[in-house]
């Protein structure tokens, strides 16, 4: 191998590493982390502060980050523009609101639509029911953990089952065994009810477009009013809503069997 070839290979590897590092930095943001400092980036990613600062400065120049009044970094205009563009061009986002409003009214609970993010469901739209005294809701943009009903539905029906298995393998012991059992049950019955937060029940079903699962639709409510039973009337409404939205998207509702 010539020296010029080796130099080119090293440059390619450096470019790939830089892209990976940028992804890691942007992944630090979530609903609980609205801004970060270069010191926090360095600590969380195992970088020295000079390198972290250099990355953050470059991302500001590219429009992916911005400086706030406190000197920290927040998502930049280009990132927000791309995010809005990506979400806005998901057909399910445009078609779901009418179905979610009807679902919320019919069940007297908040309706929640989730799309699949990098490593799990992301809350993309919420329709609250204002007629109830106690409103249980969830913030748009929240990343849901693996033990939620929405996660289990995605794990059951996602097209890339190898990646789903790797994701589940981040757990171990009884927690992993329990999750695999529950995901298998979702494939069998076509829906999931779970209480991942004490006192709060979520009942979820999959939504499909022509390519496969594209979202989950769910209701969330207090455990003293929202049943986790397979014959609960609220569950029937959730499944019916998921089936109707799937039909409107041109998909096949897989829990109903083969096409």
Question: Could you tell me what each predicted segment is?
Answer:
Residues 15-19, 76, 89, 93, ...:
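Short, structured helix-loop boundary elements
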Residues 28, 44, 95-106, 110-112, ...:
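Amphipathic alpha-helical regulatory segments at dimerization interfaces
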Residues 66, 112-114, 194:
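Conserved beta-strand cores of small sensory beta-sandwich domains that regulate signal transduction
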Residues 71-167:
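Amphipathic alpha-helical effector-binding/dimerization core
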Residues 175-247, 251, 259:
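Extended hydrophobic
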């Amino acid at each position: 191998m010539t020296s010029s070839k080796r130099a080119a290979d090293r440059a390619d590897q450096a470019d790939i590493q830089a892209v990976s590092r940028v992804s890691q930095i942007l992944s630090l943001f979530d609903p609980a982390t609205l801004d970060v400092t270069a010191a926090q980036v360095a600590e969380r990613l195992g970088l020295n502060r000079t390198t972290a600062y250099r990355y953050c400065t470059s991302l500001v120049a590219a429009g992916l980050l911005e400086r706030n009044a406190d000197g920290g970094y927040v998502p930049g205009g280009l990132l927000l523009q791309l995010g809005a563009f990506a979400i806005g061009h998901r057909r399910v986002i445009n078609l779901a609101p009418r179905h979610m409003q009807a679902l919320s009214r019919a069940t007297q609970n908040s309706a929640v639509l989730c799309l699949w993010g990098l490593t799990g469901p992301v809350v993309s739209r919420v329709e609250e029911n204002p007629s109830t005294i106690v409103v249980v809701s969830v913030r748009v943009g929240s990343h849901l953990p693996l033990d939620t009903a929405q996660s289990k539905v995605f794990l059951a029906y996602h097209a890339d089952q190898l990646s789903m298995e790797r994701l589940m393998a981040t757990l171990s012991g009884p927690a992993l065994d329990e999750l695999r059992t529950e995901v298998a049950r979702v494939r069998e019955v076509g829906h999931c009810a779970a209480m991942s937060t004490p006192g709060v029940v979520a009942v979820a079903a999959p939504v499909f477009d022509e390519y496969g699962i594209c979202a989950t639709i769910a209701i969330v409510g207090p455990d003293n009013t929202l049943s986790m039973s397979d014959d609960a009337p609220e569950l029937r409404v959730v499944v019916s809503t998921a089936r109707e939205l799937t039909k409107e998207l041109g998909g096949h509702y897989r829990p109903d069997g083969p096409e």
